[in-house]
Amino acid sequence: MNVKIKKLHNWDMTPTEAILLQRELAQKVSACGTLSSISLVAGADVWHSRTSGMGRAAVVVLSYPDMNLVEVSRSEGDCHIPYIPGLLSFREMPLLLSAFEGLESMPDLILMDGQGLAHPRRLGIASHLGLFLNKPVIGCAKSRLVGEYTPLADEAGSYSDLYHNSQLVGRVLRTRRGVNPLFISVGHKICLEEACSRVADCCRGYRLPEPLRHAHLAAAELI
């Protein structure tokens, strides 16, 4: 195991305490940084059973830029904390961190299925993960949590900036013509421009970029 994970805090806290912690941790998120070279990129996703409290996290590492499969790590267990809007990371992070601990090699960049700065308190799961790993993370969500944006064109590559309370928090990016766009935001240690560029580089004709598409399949045990 070559993945180093910081010990930021424990998980035994009330929703009120979690919100206060989010506000504190948000001050530590870096929304700048340039990746000089990338050889490995990972996608991370969490699957939840509809009939039980079980969850399964998957981290899939691909080579960059050719997107060949390198490694898959999974972790499953009970998600004891119920889903509360805005507090997703407190439900999913323990499983995610366990999956990252199972990796043999640490990726240079991580795409997380979820929000980064596009969050009411600027600490979505992608930003929270970035602080634990101290690595560049991009939030790549399939739906909007906060913010407003102008309609974008139907062509792949079209985008619109996402604003919340007059602050730029992300970008709405259409990765494939005729399909719903993705909501891209800074997770940690990367700027928004590069985050969107890297997501586009990882797309191979599907709505989801390859690291997240593989992570979604791995979490559902389809690969």
UniProtKB/Swiss-Prot annotation:
It holds the Pfam family Endonuclease_5. Keywords: Cytoplasm, DNA damage, DNA repair, Endonuclease, Hydrolase, Magnesium, Metal-binding, Nuclease. Its cofactor is Mg(2+). Its main location: cytoplasm. Mg(2+) binds at D45, D113. It is found in: Cytoplasm. It catalyses: Endonucleolytic cleavage at apurinic or apyrimidinic sites to products with a 5'-phosphate. The keyword Calcium does not apply. GO terms for cellular component: cytoplasm. Its EC number is 3.1.21.7. DNA repair enzyme involved in the repair of deaminated bases. Selectively cleaves double-stranded DNA at the second phosphodiester bond 3' to a deoxyinosine leaving behind the intact lesion on the nicked DNA. Belongs to the endonuclease V family. This is Endonuclease V. The gene is nfi.
